[in-house]
Amino acid sequence: TFWGFSTENFRERAHMELRSIFSLNKKAIELLYALNRKKWNLRFRVIGNMKRLPGDLQKMLKTCERKTKKNTGTTVIAAINYGGRDELVRVMKKMIKSGNPVSEKNFAACLDTAGIPDPDLIIRTGGRNRLSGFMPWQSVYSELYFTDTLWPDFSEQELDKAIAWFRTIQRNFGK
């Protein structure tokens, strides 16, 4: 999962800055989609509150999801206008509207990530030792790796370090 920007970023940023962020997100999606068609067989999913995004970005994201829906490779999730609190509020609204009984199973079925396994490892770049509202429900048993490296400088070698660290962890899932 790549966190393109948060709901808080959406509320706090100036219009011109948001346009730049949207443009960068579109370029990244176009690049990933083009590379994917050639060799990776990735499946794309988008999480977040899409309703507030520009129409062309919404269309691009929906098209990318639709065209890769049957791919069998790794699932790549783009968190666009995503915030953990926002997701939890949207889940509660769906639950109330559905009338289904409140249960962990029904709650999880309403999450943006329904049908996708919870993350095993979350890597936080930029020297911040917090999740900033990233997947509060899904991250309960995730291992957290924090690095001072900024996202633009996060290299394949940095990823290898994080994965090597993860492999040393004895996971107990609350036991």
Regions found by a protein language model. Name each.
Residues 1-175:
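Flexible, compositionally biased loop and terminal segments
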